[in-house]
Amino acid sequence: MNSHENRVAAPLLSFRLSLVLFAVLSVLPLGGCARWDNPVLSVKETSAAQLLGANQINAATRQRILRAVGEDAQERALRDDLKQHPGNVDAAIRLTKALVAQKRPHEALQVLDNVLVVTPDNLRALNAKAVILDIEGRHDAAQELYRQALETNPENQMLHHNLHLSLAFEGKSEQRTLPQSR
């Protein structure tokens, strides 16, 4: 071999060696995921109980798992309670808070609508629904509900406050919305 052939063959050999090394290093990690009796990649689901007790999981991940499992169980319990007692405003409001925290306001509105069918003049349910409508940016509908609730109880400071906030969010300031105290 002359020196010209060595200059061409050395980089070519190095390139081939790199490709082989890359292929081997790519396949080895995948081989660790496959089982011998089944050559495809194996996926094994781990139960929530096993995850909660696992020592390899760091504390932050364990907290997220606990929160997710707890929220799901709490939501199921509240929904079951509402199925048995459709007019349970306390359970509806707790479920509504959980759904809004999970960024599911449409479901929260459905829960409150179902409660309002059973107890149409409940101030807490009307207020909760109006608050969610405000969160969604539907201020006119929210203000209508606040006014409806204020007709039932004109002295309720929470309803007055929430109506003022709704008007402020919308950029309005109406004095006619507030009933005059005598």
Curated annotation (Swiss-Prot):
Keywords: Membrane, Plasmid, Repeat, TPR repeat, Transmembrane, Transmembrane helix. It is found in: Membrane. The chain crosses the membrane at residues 17-34. SUPFAM superfamilies: TPR-like. The keyword Transmembrane helix applies. It holds the Pfam family TPR_19. It is a single-pass membrane protein. GO terms for cellular component: membrane. TPR repeats lie at residues 89-122, 123-156. It comes from the Bacteria. PANTHER family: CELLULOSE SYNTHASE OPERON PROTEIN C, TPR REPEAT-CONTAINING PROTEIN MJ0798. This is Uncharacterized protein y4yS.
